[in-house]
Amino acid sequence: LIDHLVGTYENPPRSTVAQAYDFIIETLEEAVTLMSEEKNNGRMNKYAARALLARIYLYHDDNRKAFDLADQLIKDADTSESYALYPHEKYVAAWSVEAKFGSESFFEIANSVDDTPGRDSWGYLLNWYGYQKGFVTQKYAEQMLADPGDVRGQLLEENKYAGKTVWWLYKLRGTDLKTAPLECNNVVLRLSEVYLIAAEAGCKLGGDAAVQGLGYLNEIVKRGNPDNEVTMADYTLDRVLDERSKELVGEGHRFFDLLRNGKTIVRKGGYHLPSVDEEVDWDFYKCVLPIPEDQFIFSPEMEQNPGYPKN
């Protein structure tokens, strides 16, 4: 952990995962007391800090704190003039480049055509004009297309790639849908995720928290398709994770959702992969990246992550 200006010859030791979590939580808890509630596009505020802290609590398996913070944040957003869930009828439009910093947005990284990194931009990677492999998995496409009433399916666009029918994800759109979306913002924290944090934490806690958590889950489910609803009998961790995959697709959560809940990662053959299904256990050593070799020049006593050679 680096919490001060490091000198030229200073070589801080490696911290534990627990120490890292403690430091992050302590920093965010302090930030919440210092930051303004005013929405300032492209910058963090108190709402954004609380949303990130709720996510950290959930990752840390502190479900009571995750639920209580998410629950209060939802209530505060509901009474604010700045934040609200995107309604069903405006959901697709909310992802257009013209709708940056929408009512759900707590924090997003601002991009413009003047500062775009070009081929290194997120939009380029996900666009048919770019690397041409930014389409969703076959499993996800089939799941969304099976429910034509779910408005989130309208973010998928049918296309052809290598002679196959594939489905592009249009959460990151260009200004005209003909060129790579280089000026799309990167959404980091939004209100829908906070609803799903409360839903997951409530499911794990049970009792009154589960009753409230189910209500928050159904806010997201019914916003997608007003005819759908999850009953208490179907309110399970897997159902919550399934809804997270639908709502947060393309936002970088699914892999970590599975790991932190001890789930097996199942990679089904389809558009991207061979026809053979592949399963990866959550504790497989490659789920954690190796420490770069150059680091050992400065810290020769540091241990490499399990499973990887040190040189």
Residue ranges and their predicted role:
Residues 1-124, 133, 145-311:
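Acidic/polar-rich alpha-helix caps and helix-coil junctions
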Residues 128-142:
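Short, cationic low-complexity segments
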